[in-house]
Regions:
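Alpha-helical segment of the N-proximal tetratricopeptide repeat
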Residues: 34-64, 75-78
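Terminal, low-structured helical/coil segments at or just beyond the last alpha-helical repeat
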Residues: 207-254
Length: 254
């Protein structure tokens, strides 16, 4: 017969054994920790101006599947290292794994022909990917490209409106022009005035503010007092509601 004290020892040994297994597991680096650590080290090197060391760290992180490392490599090649082909390669690699900012940057590369030939179809494709992920710059650039494509005026207006909804001042100015010209939407001077007001409210640079004010001033020479008052009322309401409610009529197509 086994003594009782030995039974107690056996029951105590089992949880202690598993405790040490758990402790070792928790303290060991996971697969996710490796690229994160390499990215952080690379960022530290970048801040110190040690770009070759940053490059090495981020390439190591890229090899283990980090989309953030791919994006940072694209950023490094695009800026400091001035290599458009390598920048496009890594931006596109990150974009393919769903990195939204990388998708915008790939669109820019194809639109401008940097590191590749100009390819507007590919630019539209990549802007579309980021646009559906709620990136206002992608939505604006997509709208700008579609505006130049025959039969795409309505779709262009839609994306300008979606970008405007996210607070893009240039998109509001583009909407104003569409309402004045009836491009992709019915002519409507009141809504053009609203769009100018919102562009002025959201703009952060003097040039953009002055363009929206100038356009609004020209509009007011063609509008009645009642139209101007209505435009001002709608603008105030739109700002108070943080652009959400007003977009239903700014986005409306003919």
């Amino acid at each position: 017969m086994i003594p009782k004290k030995n039974i107690k020892i056996k029951f105590l040994e089992i949880p202690i054994f598993f405790f040490f297994i758990w402790l070792c597991f928790c303290n060991s680096p996971t697969k996710a920790d490796l690229p994160r650590g390499l990215i952080t080290e690379g960022l530290n090197f970048y801040d110190e101006g040690k770009y070759a060391d940053a490059l090495q760290k981020w390439k190591s992180a890229s090899k283990v599947g980090s989309q953030e490392a791919d994006f940072l490599l694209g950023f490094l090649y695009d800026g400091i290292l001035q290599n458009d082909k390598e920048a496009l390669f890594f931006f596109e690699k990150a974009a393919l794994s769903g990195h939204v900012q990388a998708q915008v940057n790939v669109g820019l590369k194809y639109e401008r022909g940097e590191g590749t030939n100009v390819n507007k179809d590919k630019a539209i494709y990549w802007y579309s990917q980021a646009a559906f992920n709620q990136d206002d710059i992608a939505q604006f650039r997509l709208a700008s490209l579609l505006q130049k494509v025959s039969g795409k005026a309505r779709e262009s207006h839609f994306w300008f409106a979606k970008s405007a909804e996210l607070g893009n001042a240039e998109a509001h100015l583009a909407l104003a022009t569409n309402f004045i010209l009836g491009r992709g939407v019915g002519k409507n001077l009141t809504l053009a005035h609203v769009s100018c007001n919102l562009a002025t409210f959201l703009s952060r640079d003097i040039d953009s503010i002055s363009r929206s004010i100038q356009l609004r001033t020209e509009l007011e020479t063609k509008m009645s007092t009642d139209q101007i008052k209505e435009a001002e009322r709608l603008s105030r309401k739109c700002i108070e509601k943080k652009f959400k409610e007003c977009m239903s009529y700014l986005i409306e197509l003919e």
